[in-house]
Curated annotation (Swiss-Prot):
Specifically methylates the uridine in position 2552 of 23S rRNA at the 2'-O position of the ribose in the fully assembled 50S ribosomal subunit. It comes from Rickettsia conorii (strain ATCC VR-613 / Malish 7). Transmembrane segments: none annotated. This is Ribosomal RNA large subunit methyltransferase E. Belongs to the class I-like SAM-binding methyltransferase superfamily. RNA methyltransferase RlmE family. Keywords: Cytoplasm, Methyltransferase, rRNA processing, S-adenosyl-L-methionine, Transferase.
Amino acid sequence: MTNNLSGYRNKFVRVKTSKKRTVSSSNWLRRQLNDPYVAKARIDGFRSRAAYKLLEIHEKFKLFTPNMKIVDLGAAPGGWSQVASKLIKASDNNLNNKIISIDVLEIEHVAGVEFVQKDFFEADTEELIIQALDGRADIVMSDMASNTIGHKATDHIRTLLLCEQAFEFALKVLKPSGHFIAKIFRGGAENELLHKVKREFKTVKHFKPSSSRSESTEIYLVALNKK
């Protein structure tokens, strides 16, 4: 199982105080050093702990199969693209599988992944992606979140707006029966978006992977079978 952390739970690591480091930076560093999924990702060769979230989503919903076309929005540092590549058995020589990863930040090459360094909000991105896919996508996935400021309501709205834009993008590039996966933060304002998604997909589920930090309000919207 992807959430088997045997051997990854180490003794608690304390972070020494530093005048050059803010309290929030110290808290983030402490959390990273004591997070078993961070340690597991390092050993398993994944670029981020977020890889395990997508693995759990796949275990729950069985979304990925060989010979798929996938778009990964906001892909950096590439953890989700790595997982998708493994699950569909992508390789640089296999033309039946296509993964297009988009981000304004550069990511290192992943086998079977074509990286587009671009903001997906730009007007020409949709047509560019369709051309790169040579058709429509089976899955559009987004683990994007806005930079958090610690104010839950603001963080909720900002990430929800990203999800809405990813959803509108997905409607344009997904084939019928395609799937959409995206991160949202719970906060009350997501209901309107959920109604929109339910009108466009046959099945819509919420899922919180065990690899998602318990204190986080993040959940994943899993929309199956575009109408």
